[in-house]
Structures are given as C-alpha cells and as structure tokens.
Amino acid sequence: MTKSELIERLASQQSHIPAKAVEDAVKEMLEHMASTLAQGERIEIRGFGSFSLHYRAPRTGRNPKTGDKVDLEGKYVPHFKPGKELRDRANIYGN
C-alpha cells in the first residue's frame, strides 16, 4: 500500500472528513515521526510496533560493478520492530 492508497482508503472510510484534511493529517504524522527519529528518539505505537535508530558500524564494502573495495562510514538507519498484535495478525494472514 502506498501513501496515496492509504490516504484514499482513510478518506473513503471517514466520509465526514474532507480528503484534503485526511491527506494533511497523514503527511503531518509521517513528518513528525521522521523528525522525531532524526532527533534520535524512539517512537512506540502500542500493539503496532516501535521505530528506532540502529547504528551500522563502519565497514568495507565492494562496488558491485567493478568489485573494488569501498570504505563505508558508520551510520544510523531506521529500524522497525513489530508489536505482538501486528505479528499475530501477520501470522493469521500468512497461514
């Protein structure tokens, strides 16, 4: 599901709210989550999961075209850990 599809689905389920308001709310929520993570804070949504930053240590990689070694700097990457309810629902779908 893309962001546009999410906005469309929410707008159709909440017909009393204008589609533009739904779009603005979704965009604002995602922007707030991104800025919170960028500040190094953790986001927890009970039953859904948590977002945090994990550190990737510096390492030596390879250029896929040439095979040359490339030194990669350490960096923080976003990480999502699903909550129990989300894991359980995914298992129902997967079975």
From Swiss-Prot:
GO terms for cellular component: chromosome; cytosol. The keyword DNA-binding applies. It holds the Pfam family Bac_DNA_binding. GO terms for biological process: DNA recombination; regulation of DNA-templated transcription; regulation of translation. Heterodimer of an alpha and a beta chain. Belongs to the bacterial histone-like protein family. HAMAP family: IHF_beta (MF_00381). NCBIfam families: hip, PRK00199.1. This is Integration host factor subunit beta. It comes from Enterobacter sp. (strain 638). The gene is ihfB.
